[in-house]
């Protein structure tokens, strides 16, 4: 960690976030690529500082041009999404290769996951192995609409039997594992998130600067399936249920009758779709249960399932109460994605998992 990053961390620890931003800015002006990258990341999502995404993206671009691997890694995510930079999947993969060639283990792992190739499997050695891995990635797979099956027409519930690959499932699990925290629910009385007996599982959330290209690829496949933009998606969350853990009956829509939620709907829109990706299936129980529909679904590894949370007019659909039943013997993993009815990408984000 450079002196500027250490100083910024000390300021943040003391609650002096403006001083932290200023320390990073001074070091950036002096050409410190680590500080430049950190400043860019913070400005893009308004992390303990101003929300200046265009400026933040500019700092990442400058750091990348200086040869900084992490800057390239973050730019890869932005480029795949078309967030604050021009959208290009080929450009995103080129940035990932750049980071991998400069030693980024995260970039190397993402390339392996997307290519479906185990480490060291017939791609040779040296810097060119990462380019060869990138060339194996089937971009059409991630950007075309997969074949699906309707489980319920009204309200709509659809399943995709071949939604993501095993290597992507493994990556998503291992990426989330060290970042898991007790999952919370919103308490409308206290106006804050709290732990509650109705939800006993763990979760790891990823904002724009902590998401990676594998997660974005999954989001793009979701986008093709539902016909809505990735820019309408909140940050992805990976959920973990140990044996006996659950979330009881609940709704995913934003309830306009809860104080302050009507303002959120006006600002960010309604959560109209929930998309789940099942990352393992070696457990008993653990179904996704829709009691009002008489439907329970035990997802297979790599399968996707989405359901609507709102009526055509945007009002909450009370039929869509659902639960994550407890696994009876082993753990359960899945990726959860909320999709809104308006653009939310680029909004100020809370600091989430690293």
Positions of PLM-derived features:
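TPR-adjacent "capping" and linker segments in tetratricopeptide-repeat scaffold/adaptor proteins
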Residues: 1-3
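Short helix-capping/linker turns of helical repeat alpha-solenoids
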Residues: 30-33, 45-47, 65-69, 81-83, ...
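Fe(II)/2-oxoglutarate oxygenase catalytic core
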Residues: 6-15, 20, 26, 41-42, ...
């Amino acid at each position: 960690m450079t002196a500027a990053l250490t100083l910024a961390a000390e300021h943040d620890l003391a609650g002096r976030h403006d001083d932290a931003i200023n320390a990073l800015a001074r070091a950036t002006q002096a050409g410190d690529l680590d500080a430049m990258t950190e400043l860019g990341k913070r400005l893009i999502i308004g992390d303990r500082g101003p929300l200046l995404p265009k400026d933040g993206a500019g700092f990442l671009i400058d750091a990348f041009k200086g040869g900084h691997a992490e800057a390239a890694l973050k730019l890869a995510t932005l480029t795949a999404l078309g967030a604050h930079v021009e959208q290009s999947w080929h450009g995103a993969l080129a940035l990932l290769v750049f980071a991998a060639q400069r030693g980024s283990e995260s970039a190397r792992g993402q390339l392996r996951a997307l290519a479906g190739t185990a480490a060291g499997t017939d791609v040779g050695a040296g810097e060119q192995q990462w380019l060869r891995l990138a060339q194996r990635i089937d971009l059409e797979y991630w950007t075309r609409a997969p074949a699906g099956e309707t489980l319920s027409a009204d309200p709509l519930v659809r399943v995709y039997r071949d939604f993501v690959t095993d290597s992507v499932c493994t990556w998503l699990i291992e990426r989330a594992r060290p970042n898991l925290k007790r999952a919370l629910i919103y308490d409308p009385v206290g106006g804050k998130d709290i732990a509650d007996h109705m939800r006993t599982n763990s979760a790891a959330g990823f904002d724009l600067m902590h998401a990676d290209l594998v997660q974005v690829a999954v989001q793009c496949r979701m986008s093709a399936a539902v016909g809505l933009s990735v820019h309408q998606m909140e940050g992805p969350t990976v959920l973990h249920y140990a044996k006996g853990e659950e979330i009881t009956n609940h709704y995913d829509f934003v309830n306009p009758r809860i104080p302050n939620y009507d303002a959120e709907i006006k600002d960010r829109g309604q959560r109209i779709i929930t998309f789940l990706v099942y990352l393992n299936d070696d457990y008993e129980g653990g179904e996704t249960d829709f009691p009002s529909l008489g439907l329970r679904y035990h997802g297979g590894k790599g399968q996707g399932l989405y359901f609507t949370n709102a009526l055509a007019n945007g009002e909450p659909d009370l039929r869509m109460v659902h639960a994550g039943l407890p696994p009876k013997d082993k753990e359960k993993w899945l990726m959860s994605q909320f999709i809104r009815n308006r653009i939310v990408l680029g909004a100020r984000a809370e600091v989430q998992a690293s």
